[in-house]
Structure formats: C-alpha cells, structure tokens
Amino acid sequence: DADTGYGNELNVTRTVREYERAGIAAIHIEDQASPKRCGHLDGKELIPLNEYVAKIRAAAAARHDPNFVIIARTDANAVTGFEDSINRANTALANGADIAFVEAPKTIDEVTAIPKRVKGPCLLNVVTGGITPDLNMADARDMGYRIAILPSLLTSAIMSACDKALADFKSTDMPPNSAHLPSVGDRFARFRADYWNEIRTKFHSS
C-alpha cells in the first residue's frame, strides 16, 4: 500500500523504485488528495484524472522488473460516483496499471458490476465493518475478482478479543483461563525465539 505515492509523479517514481528494490512484488497507488483518508470513511477528496494518470504512467515506467505489479486504486465511488470510478479504473489500466482496485463499492450490485465493466484484472477490498457488503471469497472468485485483500481481518479479531479479556478481568478479578490460551513457550515459538536463541548460543561471549 503506497497510498498516494507520497506526492506527484516524481515522488511516485522514487516510491516504485524503492519498493521494488526492497523486494516488494506489487504496489497500489490511489487517486485521493493528500493527506488521504481510509477508503471506508467520509471526507475524501480526489485529485484530477490527469494527475492520477500521470502517477500511474510514472509508476509503470519506473519499474525495472516487468513482473512488478502496479495496482491502480480509485476512491471515486464515494466522491464522484460509480460511473466515474469505472472510468478512472479503465483509464488507469489503459495507461500502464496491471490491476484495477475500485475502492468501497456500496452494494452487491456494484461489487458484481466492477469485474464485468473494468477492462482488466480487479482487486476486491474486504474491510470488516466497512462500506462494502460482506462477501464469500468463492463468490468473489466467481464474479471475476483476481485478488482479494482483508486488511482488518486480524486487527478486528484482536480488538474484540482484547476487549473481552479486559471486560472479563474487570468483572471477575481473574485473568483468563490459561487452559484456553497459548502457553508461554508457544507464544515465544510463534515469534521464532528459537532462531534468536541459536544466535545467542553461537555468539555468546564467555
């Protein structure tokens, strides 16, 4: 997620090169004005289409690896309407983007229409509690989406679990039942403590 590309076409050029150098496989750049907002919140503003196109063209030209994927995101649906979002997606694809990302469709009809009307591969953003209706991933594949991202899947679950644990502790004065939780060893193993312990053992000074 490269947001707006962090500036104009000059900044986008540098952003793409830095991301590619870091080993990133794909990048998405959007048409919001900076400072941007979450695509599922109100109050967004768009840059003009010609500025958006300039960024996409610069991004496509800046990559060295032809397999580095440029994803063009448009937030137009919430600002100027669904038709403009489709137009912006198709214009971005015609100017070098590999995948179109129409952010925040509001109805199942819009979700269904996007891969039919966009002239290239489409990405679906599934935000828990967001504007877009909940959708089974098998149905999304059948509609024609090539990629789906679920950016709030784990954060939402973590927030709910934390809220419940704190509420239970407040009401009972007891910590959660450890029988239902990972052990200390399991928690350290999840974050590869064994790897760091090997380094400690190998290089420990006596």
Enumerate the language-model features and the residues they cover.
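Alpha/beta enzyme core
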Residues: 2-168, 196, 202-206
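Flexible C-terminal active-site loop/helix
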Residues: 169-206
